[in-house]
């Protein structure tokens, strides 16, 4: 089954060219089945790029997916056209009475700020509490995952002396987890962050289980059964050239930045990077959607009851 998105959303053409099945709302209605309703709370400045990345992953399963784009109500983006935001996004305050089978909370380039100093922190806390009554399963990504694990468990983020930047090998710590079904013993994941969550603090929190971790860059994927959530601190959703774009941006700005490790062949930025994470990215998000499909009530209004 395809992903259901507006025909004029940029992701529609991108995914169609890539061979992902997409359909507009009129086509979806003719199938007469209940799609999984997935929300994307997009906190990234490059909204369209992020939409494409997540739509690609959640649209590649046999399930029909209805993707809803959500923004913070009071925060105004400066990097995406107002027309795009008005056409395709709904503010959280307008959708808070609705139910979702799944919600993705993206990262945001605000790691240097304490959580309480983020301008929309109060509303984001409201969102996270709202997931406990209105969302069947929530996936917090990078800063979004850090915010969730801090909000629900008090686990702190810590600044790194140098940016964790590159593609790092991670170990499969929970081969029996349904979220890691089909995973190899090790996988490579893009990492791009100035902060870390520490395994000792995750272990000290009640009800958390680390599923993927790295000796070099620490815990990556954490399951929180009590809050029906997954937290991932790295970037399976990244395109092949996302790390290159970040590196080139910082070089052009004169910022001190190391070449992303294990990304370019022989760590040579003059060569085209290799994508070594795509298959595991599809596995993880496909497994997440499968778990939602198996557990979510058919009557979406029954979520949270």
From Swiss-Prot:
Q: Which GO terms describe its biological process?
A: L-methionine biosynthetic process from homoserine via O-succinyl-L-homoserine and cystathionine
- Pfam family for this entry, one: HTS
EC number(s) stated in the UniProt entry for this protein: 2.3.1.31
Question: Where in the cell?
Answer: Cytoplasm
Domain of life of the organism encoding this protein? Bacteria
CDD domains assigned to the protein according to its UniProt record, in alphabetical order: GATase1_HTS
* Catalytic class of the enzyme: transferase
Please name the catalytic residues of this protein. Answer: 142 (acyl-thioester intermediate), 235 (proton acceptor), 237
This protein's pathway reads: Amino-acid biosynthesis; L-methionine biosynthesis via de novo pathway; O-acetyl-L-homoserine from L-homoserine: step 1/1
- Gene Ontology molecular function, alphabetical: homoserine O-acetyltransferase activity; homoserine O-succinyltransferase activity
Q: What is the first-listed, main subcellular location in coarse terms?
A: cytoplasm
**Which reaction equation describes what this protein catalyses?**
L-homoserine + acetyl-CoA = O-acetyl-L-homoserine + CoA
Q: Does the keyword Flavoprotein apply?
A: no
Q: Where is this site: Important for substrate specificity?
A: 192
Residues at site: Important for acyl-CoA specificity? 111
| Amino acids binding substrate | 163, 192, 249
Q: Which UniProt keywords apply?
A: Acyltransferase, Amino-acid biosynthesis, Cytoplasm, Methionine biosynthesis, Transferase
A single cellular component GO annotation: cytoplasm
The entry assigns this protein to a family as follows:
Belongs to the MetA family.
PANTHER family in the cross-refs: HOMOSERINE O-SUCCINYLTRANSFERASE
- Function, please? Transfers an acetyl group from acetyl-CoA to L-homoserine, forming acetyl-L-homoserine.
Q: What is this protein called?
A: Homoserine O-acetyltransferase
Native source species? Roseobacter denitrificans (strain ATCC 33942 / OCh 114) (Erythrobacter sp. (strain OCh 114))
Native organism taxonomy: Bacteria, Pseudomonadati, Pseudomonadota, Alphaproteobacteria, Rhodobacterales
